[in-house]
Amino acid sequence: MKQFFSLLLALPLAAATISDRARDLHRGALVFDAHVHVVNRQFYHGGDIGQRMPDGQFDLPRARQGGVGALFFSIFVTEDYYPQRFETKQTLRLIDLALTQLEHNRDKIELALNARDIERIHRAGKIAAVLDLEGGFDLDGDLGVLRDLYRLGLRSAQLSAHNWANNFADSCCSTPKVHGLNDQGRAVIREMNRLGMVINISHASSEAVEQALEVSTAPLVATHSGMRALNDIPRTMPDDLMRKVAAKGGVIGFQIGNEFHNRKVFDYVTAHAGKPFWDTGDIAARQLPLSIEQIDKLVAPKFPMLGSDAPDALLLTPSEWIGVLERAIAIVGEDYVAIGSDFDGGPTPPRGMHSIADLPLLTGAMLERGWPEPRIRKVLGLNMLRVFRTITEGPGPTFRP
């Protein structure tokens, strides 16, 4: 393990030049990326997360190069599986693959169930992986299914079914079903509080988030979001809601894509696609029934989800992207802001950034803009770690026969 850790420190942190101070600071910090699509490529196309890939934005070699110490490992169940009610089966298939990949690469990455695990794994020179469900684990919010997923190692789950409303919580990107949360949605939140699971409000409607803040006894986490003041789209968060999330002790991870924070790129991507990136109307229009294997074949070409071909001249620079975080800090304070890249989930990163290997460029930009080192360490990872500790390290759940 010492040999692995020495190798980690010897790796170049980014292809582009950054200062020695930035390099040393990044190496010494806990870099906690709150949202990464780790295994969707492997599920549909095979392969090993431990091998460097010729395309895409994530694999373990590039994560190590980027200095990543912990990440929310997305279990992403796409909307394609919902009309046939395959969402729970697909969740289990992805968790099975995730655990298999973690075991196969146990010298590099390890499952983390709480903040103590993250710290222990990080000290050992490995990446700590927190399983986070993106999409619907069960569209009806079955608490038994939720408990079973907890037992399998899941420690975070989104309220909504990605960009679709489920039967207990509304999404920001679809027609409301329950006007925020219904009684079952409130029961899901109470059970997640009891279990010590992160309530991930990314993709949830503002109304659902407001109501979740009233019900939850624990802080809420937006693993990958944006600022509506900079780009007025459903997937970004208005300032007043950000303040409320922070007031409850939560944290907001900012997605790295230009689509979230740069209206010019959002308009470019929308014009070229003929629809906004969250539009899944083609799925709802499919002729049914379809087998799960047929759905797999329809979904496979989507992965890995790559960024757009928007011209470099339109893209934010790393420094300009850090300016987004500065605006967020001005609103909620430096203790409530984090990074949730969404790599391999389709973001168009800042100019000169191509993959998770390039995260050190953000640290360099923070220093260039005059950020003090304590603030940098908070935003890179300590804020997310603090909230994860608060949520997961209570007395622990009791399971009754």
Predicted regions and their residues:
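N-terminal hydrophobic targeting/anchoring segments and the immediately downstream early-domain regions
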Residues: A15-H179, R228, D232-P401
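Substrate-binding cleft of carbohydrate-active enzyme catalytic domains
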Residues: A187-I201, E207-Q211, D239-A247, R327
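Extended hydrophobic secondary-structure segments
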Residues: N40, N193-A212, D335-G346
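Hydrophobic h-region of N-terminal signal peptides that target proteins for export
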Residues: S6-A16
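Active-site glycine-rich loop that binds ribose-phosphate moieties when present
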Residues: H179-A187
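Positively charged n-region of N-terminal signal peptides that target proteins for export
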Residues: M1-Q3
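Short hydrophobic/aromatic-enriched beta-strand-loop microsegments
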Residues: P219-S225
